Amino acid sequence: MELLNGKIKPIYFKYLSASFGTALIASVYSIVDVAMVGQYQGPEGTAALAVVAPLWNIIYSLGLLVGIGGSVLFSARRGGGRGDGSENQYFTAAAIGAVILAALAWAGIWCFEGPILTFFGADESLLALAQRYMQPIKPVFPLFLLNQLLAGFLRNDGNPGLATMSVLAGGIFNVFGDYFFVFPCDMGVYGAGLATAIGSGISFLVMLIHFVGRKNTLRLVRPERLGEKLRAISVTGFSTFFVDVAMGILTVLFNRQIMRWLGSDAMAVYGPIIQISTFAQCCAYSVGQASQPIISMNYGAAKAGRIRQTLRLALYTVAFFSIFWTALSLACPNFYIRIFMSPTPAILAIAPAIIRTYALSFPLLPLNIFSTYYFQAIMKPGAAFIVSVARGLVVSGVLILALPAVLGANALWLAMPITELLVAIYTVAAMKKYTKTLPATGDRL
């Protein structure tokens, strides 16, 4: 197999180029929507989509839970060389789990949309805009979860290019559809939601092509001990799931704290910050998703040297993204603001300090996120759990709540830089420990 015997460097960059596109599936839709709505509706539109942002984190994180969890086990089982097709039991179990989660999420958004958006920080004026945006998205809401599931398994089934093509097809439509529906059709925020909904459907249909192609080895089979496999998928995928859902939790905490301590102008600035952070986070996803199939399969085959080669390339890539996003954010903060809205003078006055302070989290954010993929791929879900929960809830949550009360309102923006620093200390120590003890022989599943 290519992943077990081919040269690591070309394989890694082949998968990186593909996974970079698929990892942006979350940000392409939301970033274009925020930019178009911000230009059409102004700061109020940007703030309304900041309220919706946690919904994206939730639905994508559920897709990552089953998509990454299932595909890691799929590749590790295949790398173990059994040759009996048993890896497809994990594909089937992941598909069943995805359908269940999609149905629950779909029911929740139809039945409790208003209370959910209010809890996420919407006041009366923002709630109406947020609900208008969600109106065309609700009928296809499960597709956003299923797209993540399929992308994960396509990468691990040797077809990362099709996963990328699906994102490009849906994303390109979304870009032009956003403009067409929002401005020429004068649909405003509803048009942005409509373009996003259609784009997700296009991505889904493109990925289905894999199942009629020659590369496809994915099969629906009867899984033995389904409950045990769903549990294994959940444990393996939990850390990646929590990285994304935690961003939603943090967005809710930030929304509520911003409205309490700083007001609506700061909330309008936070909308672009979410998009910048999502982009930086998706770059880290791409490194993790490129590395994971290679590392998982070679872990199953106990080829420690190939794992270390892949890790080295991944860390170089992580360093590049860290430098890029930090430098861009520090150099031209108001560039982001002008992309995402037609700003008022008051917003242009406060935005540079806010964005530059928050951007101090970007040097270490990609490393911490990548580490969760690495720990999962070498079957160390405990370490991945510690990183994701500390970063996504425990350390960050405490700082978001405590800093403005102790040091003043503007200290709120220091919460994420401090969080990333503290978590990175553990990440580096754990990565060194587990990399030194990689197995050289044997089957790890």
At which residue positions do the language-model features occur?
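Short alpha-helical transmembrane segments in multi-pass integral membrane proteins
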Residues: 1-19, 74-142, 184-238, 295-361, ...
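Short runs within selected transmembrane alpha-helices of multi-pass transporters and secretion channels
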Residues: 67, 137-155, 163-174, 192-207, ...
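Interfacial/gating helices of multi-pass transporter permease domains
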Residues: 37-57, 125-129, 189-190, 229-236, ...
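Small-residue-rich hydrophobic transmembrane alpha-helices
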Residues: 46-107, 144-163, 269-327, 331-333, ...
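N-terminal transmembrane alpha-helices
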Residues: 3-40, 54-69, 73, 99-106, ...
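Alpha-helical transmembrane segments of multipass membrane proteins
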Residues: 31-35, 107, 115, 149-153, ...
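Transmembrane helical elements of multi-pass membrane transporters/channels
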Residues: 14-33, 136, 147, 170, ...
